[in-house]
Amino acid sequence: MGLYATALSNGPPVSRDASADASLVSELQARIENQRSLINIVPGEGSVLGVWVYSGDIYAFRNKAGGATTGMYRSSSTGWLEVGLGNALNFDTTTTNGELVVGASISGATSGATATVKGVSYYGNWDTGAKGCVVVDSITGVFQDNEEIQMSTIAFDGGITEIKENDSIVGSSSGSTATVKKVTITSGAYSSDDAVGFLSIVSASGSWTDNEEIQVSGVKRALVNGASEPSTVTVAKTDGELYEQTIEPNGSYKFVNFNFVGEESLEKMYGASGVGNAFEWDGTTFIKIKTGMTTDTPENVIVFKNHLFLSYPKGSLQNSSLGLP
């Protein structure tokens, strides 16, 4: 390994004494101020509320002008850039027809509005009635309050071997394909060769035929349950209208980076401020983490044994499911 000179000395070192050299202090202060002037100021007003490094980028949080909301900013070669937080829909009244999954196309049954799912956060059991929010983009139309949220799923029965998240599935006779993101079992079990349920899918191609084998790597896992799958089903209802995400003002931010999946390049950034919901950021999608707490404003965030932990005032503690923040 070679070394390269980055500067050349201009004579031998000279010792200077501030008590005897009246200009030394002012010279040093001038140099300090010169370097300070090179620092780009985070936009907004008041104190910087938190700074963190994620995926090689520096992020800072500071109240926007006026103090109504906080801005999330990323450092760049041209200065601080505000991060767009995207649009979201709150939902409730979930069903057993399948779960909302990232990458899926959804539509409003009444409005006909459409969007693509970018992130999902919810609390409670999906099969019995969960509540949460879904971050979306590529939006057309206007979603209405309390309308059914629909998406495409594949119904199956005769399940003999578990179908897992991210499995690539193929229809044995139709040649149709899709990638599985969630599996919902409504009755039966793989152990008794009679599992019944729904596959929440993305990247689907072709139309599946009733009773054809659903294969993974050429091996039968289940049978298609119904003609012309995938079919459009209701998975939840909107709880309000589409809104632009914002961050509550003030707070003191804590952060942690962690990869819950174990695959390369899937580390995400998690934050808590004490004034709003905790959040997740993957470099593209910002989503607030809903826990169901009455006052859902955690002060601290940490990861322990593949669980995300959030702490609240007066000692309350919430933790995620294993590997599922």
Where are the predicted features?
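Residues located in well-ordered beta-strands
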Residues: 105, 116, 135, 179-181, ...
